[in-house]
Amino acid sequence: MRIGLVCPYSFDEPGGVQAHMLDLATVFIEQGHFVQVLGPASAETDVPDFVVKGGGSIPISYNGSVARLSIGPQVTRRVKEFIRDGDFDVLHIHEPNSPSYSMRALSIAEGPIVATYHASAASSRLLQLARPVLSPMLEKIRGGIAVSEMARRWQVEQLGGDPILIPNGVDTSVYAAALQHSAAASNNAGDATERPLEIVFLGRLDESRKGLDVLLDALEHIDRPIRVTVMGGGHARSRSGVDFVGRVSDLDKARILGRADIYVAPNRGGESFGIVLVEAMAAGCAVVASDLEAFAAVCNVEAEQPAGLLFKNGDARDLAAKITRLIDDEHERRALISAGIQRAEQYDWDHVAAAVMQVYETVQDGTKVRVG
């Protein structure tokens, strides 16, 4: 099958949607499909060969974050070239509501079109105002996908449609291998029971909704020996006992998660899924997360044995209490780790990609994607 993927967000900066699309494309290519991805990317940005670079982008504030989007006449030209040259059987547009490559592709393309919705928010007056313009375009979508129940509900309430739920995917084998390597290294080093437990955070340091300051405040209330590693781009704080390692590669991220004991996700809001929670679970971390609806779903908190422990959003003292509890209670910590590893398997790309392919097969009618 010839598959075209369209991304609204720039590949110049790391992000969950971009990572999801690159992973999905890689899985399908490994299965023998032809796949290309179109999205904003500067000439100097290092991306896989299957990415068609769509040029520069500008930062736009949205949903508590900053998204880098492309606008202008070059977007229209490149979308048309992408569709004509690709001869695609399916065009898969991510975040079709975003005013960038995705929305333009949806307005231009005709034929077998699939869309994935990642974002969620309480409400959007802007989208309500834009609904008369968006609705005719959204009707062109033959197969809708939402990565979480929050994203699905938001789309249905704001703009209609009935997307099915297919979560984000994770290559669990990478994180499982990192965990095994870390365990082997610990065994070779001898008894590691006396070492301080390692707590890890991953997120953009300058984005308040990622909650780093909540974690740093919580550390003031933890009187147990610990080591803390912070991954992510931005301005590092000067904090004793905290190692700011900056932006890391995917392999280094897996390695750090594989050796860590507790992963903390203190995010304040604006999350519709929480892919790094799944990565941490697959790597054998006990997960402590803020009680966002999206995180509660990933942690499966209604289960007899949840896969994560939640704390009150924004409450540094409650976070400190939960971390201290896991440090002191090895049995609970190991139970969370075991449940997390099992939970992560449900998000493995083998399952997720197969579900997406079923949607592709459903929307095909023997015609090619074309410029309308």
What are these regions (language model features)?
Residues 121, 127-143, 150, 157-158:
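Membrane-proximal helix-turn-helix segments that form the acceptor-binding/catalytic region
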Residues 185-210, 216-220:
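Conserved donor-binding/catalytic core segment of Leloir-type glycosyltransferases
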Residues 318, 325, 332-346, 358:
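A short, well-ordered alpha-helix in the C-terminal region of glycosyltransferases
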Residues 41, 150, 169:
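Carbohydrate-associated surface elements
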Residues 286-289, 296:
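Short hydrophobic beta-strand element within catalytic cores of glycosyltransferases
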Residues 301-316, 324-330:
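Conserved acidic donor-binding segment of nucleotide-sugar-dependent glycosyltransferases
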Residues 258-272, 285:
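Acidic donor-binding loop of glycosyltransferase active sites
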Residues 153, 167-195:
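Acidic anion/phosphate-binding donor-loop and adjacent secondary structure
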